[in-house]
Each structure stands twice: as C-alpha cells, then as structure tokens.
C-alpha cells in the first residue's frame, strides 16, 4: 500500500469483526516491488481466514506502470509460494464472482486465488462482471472503454424497466475479451473505474 499499512490492517480487522461476509485481500503482483511481501500476506490471510487474490498487473492506470521489468506473471508468484508450502488446486471454489483460480496451501490452510488477466488466454471466459464507475457509468469490461450512463438513466427513467433495459444492453456489449494486449490506452485510474 502507498498509505498507512497499520490503518489498512486495522480496517481489514474491523471489517472481519463487524461480520462482513466477503472480505477478500487483493494484491497486484509487481516484480521488484512486492514479491517479498507475498508470503507474509499469505500468513496474514490464513490467520484471519480470508482469501488472498494475487493479480497480474494490468494497464489500467493512467500512468505507464506496466513494464517488462515490473510485470510478474501469476506462475512466478505460484513458484514463490511453492517454495514455502504445497499448492492444492481447488477448481470448484468460487469465492465471489470472478475469474480467480483458487488453491489451498496445505500447511497454512490459506486460500489463494490467482488472477492472470495478461497471461491466461481464457481469462475473459469466466468473467461475469461489469463495473460501476465513481461517476455512475456502467462499464461492461474493465479492459474496454465502452461505458453507458446509469446515473442519468436512474434520474430520468420513468420506471425500472428502462434501467433494466440499459443494464441488459450493457451486458450484451460485454466484449469476448479485454483489449489489454492490443493498443489499449488507459483513460481512467482504477479508483474511478471501481474495483
């Protein structure tokens, strides 16, 4: 985190203590930046009974952070964890509605999901998400710029049917695959897209 780690950890503990059912930890993999933190994150996740998701760096931010130097594919993260514990595939686990492939670590009991958006050619086949941006737009795909204005529809729709129609149209516009490998140029930071 670029913020106060103690505040982040306190927030996670508070969410668990408050009874939130779907607390998940996300970590964007960055070679040379956080690979030494993966095992402590696994231990923290195991201690608190939380799933940890390790996510490949994607070209989402408006700055150029995705480089060959700092990109770490999920298979490298898996190898780092295999040096500490055995990874047992859990193909039937669906913790949430995302494309993570989950494993349980034999000795720690940790649940770790790997999200290989850049290296898994079949990544998009299991994605059933749409994003709601901070300014009320529906984005059918994280890796595509197409958006529809849900906020305006909610303000001006005569009934729920118009909103349902907009959502159905947005879902139909969901592309078969993201555009990250092509000439994709980010236009919004992740904080504005919604994650």
Predicted regions and their residues:
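Radical SAM/AdoMet-radical enzyme domain recognition
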Residues: 1-55
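Auxiliary Fe-S-binding modules of radical SAM enzymes
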Residues: 43-47, 57-195
